[in-house]
Structure formats: C-alpha cells, structure tokens
C-alpha cells in the first residue's frame, strides 16, 4: 500500500489499518484524527474500556510487554502501521515485526527502543550527537546510586530509566533524601528494570516542549522537518499541570531549541510528531527528553493550532501534508480525579464552559485516582496570560464526584 497516495474505506478490504499500542487520552485523540481521514483503527491497551477503546473500530486488552502476545495480535490484525503511544511495550518484538516486513512501525522500531529508555536516548543525545544536557550518571544498585549522587552533587534529580509522567521521579537535596528517593524510583518504573538516571539540577528560567514534525514534503517527496510554536509548561512532581502556547523566548533560544530538536529527531528518523523537552535559561538551552509521539503538554494544541498535534501526527504517519502554524494563544489546565473510585461523575461542566474561550476534554477513564489526570480544560485568549487564567478557572469549576 502506498501510504499518502491512497486511503481506503474502514471495515472493507480496501481499509487502511492502523494499530495504536496505548489507548489513553493522547491515543484517543490520535484515533479520532485518523478516523476523520477514513482510517480503520485498532486500539490496544493493558486495561479494558480505556479512552481510545471507546472510539476505535476494534479494541484489545493485552500485556504489551509480552512479545508473544504482541506479535500474535499484529499477525491477527495485519495493520499497515503500528503506532506506539506509550513506553511499556516489548520493543524487541516491534523490531522483529519491522525487520520481517509485516508492517511499518512509527516512527521506527529503533526510535521506539531508544526513547522508551532514558539511558538510550540520553547516550544518543549527549554522547553521539554532542547536545547540551545536564550532568548525569546511571545506577543499577543502591550503592551505585549513592555513589552517583555523591558524584553529581546536591540537588539532583533521580528518575527510573523506564517511566513516564513523573512516576518514580524525585529531587534529592540532602543525604536524608537518598534512600527514600531510591525506594520511590524502584516503585515507579513502568517496567521492572531496577535502573535509574541521576541528573544534575539545571537552574532554568522555564521548560518548553518543542513539538517537531517529520512529514513528507508534497513538493519534493522527501521528509521535511517543521516546528510548532514552543509550548511552555508547569510541572509538579514531574507531571504537567498547565501548558500554554506560545512560550515567549529570545530569538537565539528559539533557534537553539529548534536546532537541538532537529538534530535529535533526525537521528531517530521516521515520520510523525516528536515532543522534545528542553530547559531554557536566557539564550542557553539544554536537551532533557524526547517522546516519538504526541506529548501531554501538547494537549493545548487542540485550542491553539488549526491542526492539533494529534492531527499533525495522523497526517505525518500517513504521508500527508502538515501545517503546524499557530492560530491563537491558548492554554491547558489539568483536571485531576480527586478521589479513588470507578465510574465517577463530573459537576460544574456548565460553569466551566461558560468561561470565555473555554473548552473541555473529559477523557472517559473508567477508574479515577486522586492524582490521575481525568480531563483537561482548554482556553484561548488575546495573549497567553489571559488564556492561562481562563483555562485554570475552567478547570477549577469542574468537580469530580462519586457517582454512588
């Protein structure tokens, strides 16, 4: 099948089939974007009734870290594209699937392998590409960890090499923090890996996500890199609580950010959107991480861009033209579950949507936890400050409540 030249009809022999591995809120938006282009979508996750399951043509529940289960599902569904949307996947199975020519892995199996592991991507960025990063060390045992902390110095940040959304991440400020940080990291990894990265603390002015799109240029037929406006965000305990676009920054810092993003995404290859996380202080920029998929801070693009990050990803992986331009300043603010219960309800939706320029995405997750992201408020404004105030006001109006 010539991706980009021909799209079929879902649920027919001509269908263009895409399998998403990971069906959370980001995967759900990718599925919707693909379906608007007439793509047949198979959603896969580790638990039933995930947000993406609710909108896909077919849904499956498997342990995606089990290579045999993953290969069996791909063989049964025969997708044209496999699109990982989370880190906890048997990437060796994806590499075998790609090598056998069964289907294409987005962006590539190698990119998925490197980016699911903080060690792989940090060594690529710092040691192979020579990109500026914080000082770092890796540790496999508590003794190695304590030695790494002593070498890096206080304060430092510890993260499992395999985790996401801040899980297992903490700041070590003194000797008293070392043992609790190790225990927390061991409990927070998405895969039982037992290895951590210790990073020196960078005193930055702000953090950004530089969404970077690798897509086919219709004029040349070659892969071209383009950029969204920089996204600023606020993190608490490693998890995003607010994002806004555009983030004001100097011309030099923007140039350096895009150069770093271009270099790391070119090294990873393939097509699709990449979320490149960077620290910025004045004109100086440091590489932090990269995800070869839509980024949670990029939820703001549902309001800020004519083509959201999800639409850009869908178009890029299908070989279609993209347009990542900013349409309006906008912001997002997270809505947490606030309670531990299945099948919760939400009050205050009317009040939230009465905020000028506001919109909501309630993700439909079947089970709530106090700190689980259950939705997001979006808002536009004449400028970023107004958009942020509106988004926070709309998010605060939504009240998760027990449905019992």
Curated annotation (Swiss-Prot):
It is an enzyme of class 6 (ligase). It comes from the Bacteria. ATP binds at residues 118, 159, 164-169, 199-202, 207. The keyword Acetylation does not apply. Its EC number is 6.3.1.21. One of its GO terms (biological process) is 'de novo' IMP biosynthetic process. One of its GO terms (molecular function) is ATP binding. Residues 123-318 form the ATP-grasp domain. The keyword ATP-binding applies. One of its GO terms (cellular component) is cytosol. Keywords: ATP-binding, Ligase, Magnesium, Metal-binding, Nucleotide-binding, Purine biosynthesis. Mg(2+) binds at residues 277, 289. Pathway: Purine metabolism; IMP biosynthesis via de novo pathway; N(2)-formyl-N(1)-(5-phospho-D-ribosyl)glycinamide from N(1)-(5-phospho-D-ribosyl)glycinamide (formate route): step 1/1. N(1)-(5-phospho-beta-D-ribosyl)glycinamide binds at residues 25-26, 85, 296, 365, 372-373. SUPFAM superfamilies: Glutathione synthetase ATP-binding domain-like, PreATP-grasp domain, Rudiment single hybrid motif. It catalyses: N(1)-(5-phospho-beta-D-ribosyl)glycinamide + formate + ATP = N(2)-formyl-N(1)-(5-phospho-beta-D-ribosyl)glycinamide + ADP + phosphate + H(+). NCBIfam families: PRK09288.1 (NF006766), purT (TIGR01142). Homodimer. HAMAP family: PurT (MF_01643). Belongs to the PurK/PurT family. Involved in the de novo purine biosynthesis. Catalyzes the transfer of formate to 5-phospho-ribosyl-glycinamide (GAR), producing 5-phospho-ribosyl-N-formylglycinamide (FGAR). Formate is provided by PurU via hydrolysis of 10-formyl-tetrahydrofolate. This is Formate-dependent phosphoribosylglycinamide formyltransferase. The gene is purT.
């Amino acid at each position: 099948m010539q991706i980009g030249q021909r799209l079929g009809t879902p649920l027919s022999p001509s269908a263009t089939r895409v399998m998403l591995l990971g069906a959370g809120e980001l995967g759900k938006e990718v599925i919707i974007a693909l379906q608007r282009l007439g793509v047949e979508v198979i959603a896969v996750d580790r638990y039933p009734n995930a947000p993406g399951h609710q909108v896909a043509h077919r849904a499956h529940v498997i342990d995606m870290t089990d290579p045999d289960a993953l290969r069996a599902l791909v063989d049964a569904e025969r997708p044209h594209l496999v699109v990982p949307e989370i880190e906890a996947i048997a990437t060796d199975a994806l590499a075998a699937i790609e090598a056998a020519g069964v289907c294409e892995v987005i962006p590539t199996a190698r990119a998925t392998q490197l980016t699911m592991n903080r060690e792989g991507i940090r060594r690529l960025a710092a040691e192979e590409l020579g990109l500026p990063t914080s000082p770092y060390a890796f540790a496999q045992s508590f003794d190695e960890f304590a030695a790494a902390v002593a070498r890096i110095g206080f304060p430092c940040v510890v993260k499992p090499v395999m985790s996401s959304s801040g899980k297992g991440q903490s700041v070590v400020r003194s000797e008293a923090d070392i043992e609790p940080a190790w225990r927390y990291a061991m409990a927070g990894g998405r895969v039982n890996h037992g290895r951590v990265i210790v990073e020196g603390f960078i005193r930055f002015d702000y953090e950004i996500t530089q969404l970077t799109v690798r897509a086919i240029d219709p004029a040349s037929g070659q892969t071209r890199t383009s950029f969204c406006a920089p996204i600023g965000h606020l993190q608490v305990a490693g998890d995003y609580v607010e994002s806004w676009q555009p983030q004001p920054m100097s011309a030099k810092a923007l140039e350096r950010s895009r150069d770093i993003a271009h270099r790391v995404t070119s090294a990873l290859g393939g097509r699709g959107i990449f979320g490149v996380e960077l620290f910025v202080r004045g004109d100086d920029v440091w590489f932090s991480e990269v995800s070869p998929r839509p980024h949670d801070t990029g939820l703001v693009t549902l309001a800020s861009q004519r083509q959201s990050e999800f639409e850009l990803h869908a178009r890029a992986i299908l070989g279609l033209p993209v347009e990542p331009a900013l349409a309006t300043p906008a912001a997002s603010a997270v809505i947490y579950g606030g309670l531990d219960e299945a099948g919760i309800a939400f009050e205050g939706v009317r009040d939230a949507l009465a905020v000028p320029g506001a919109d909501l995405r309630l993700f439909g997750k079947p089970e709530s936890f106090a700190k689980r992201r259950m939705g997001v408020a979006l808002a536009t404004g004449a400028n970023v400050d107004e958009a942020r105030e509106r988004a926070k006001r709309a998010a605060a109006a939504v009240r998760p409540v027990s449905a019992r």
